[in-house]
């Protein structure tokens, strides 16, 4: 679980970089939405990993 949380966190960072760095307007909007989605998925997986108690990298 923690492995997936880290993967989604990295994806959200990449999407955030493209969304907030000033690329074109359409791409920035899509990247900001993806950033929010993957950040939420990261937090959900992180909470599930902590609650499971057997989170291994």
Swiss-Prot record:
GO terms for cellular component: plasma membrane. The keyword Kinase does not apply. The chain crosses the membrane at residues 4-24, 33-53. Its main location: membrane. Keywords: Cell membrane, Membrane, Transmembrane, Transmembrane helix. InterPro entries: DUF1328 (IPR009760). Pfam families: DUF1328. Signal peptide: none annotated. It is found in: Cell membrane. It is a multi-pass membrane protein. Belongs to the UPF0391 family. This is UPF0391 membrane protein Arad_3976. It comes from Rhizobium rhizogenes (strain K84 / ATCC BAA-868). The lineage of its organism: Bacteria, Pseudomonadati, Pseudomonadota, Alphaproteobacteria, Hyphomicrobiales.
């Amino acid at each position: 679980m923690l492995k997936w949380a880290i993967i989604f966190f990295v994806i959200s960072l990449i999407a955030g970089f493209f969304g907030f760095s000033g690329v074109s307007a359409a791409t920035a909007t899509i990247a900001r939405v993806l950033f929010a989605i993957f950040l939420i998925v990261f937090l959900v997986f992180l909470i599930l990993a902590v609650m499971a108690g057997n989170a291994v990298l």
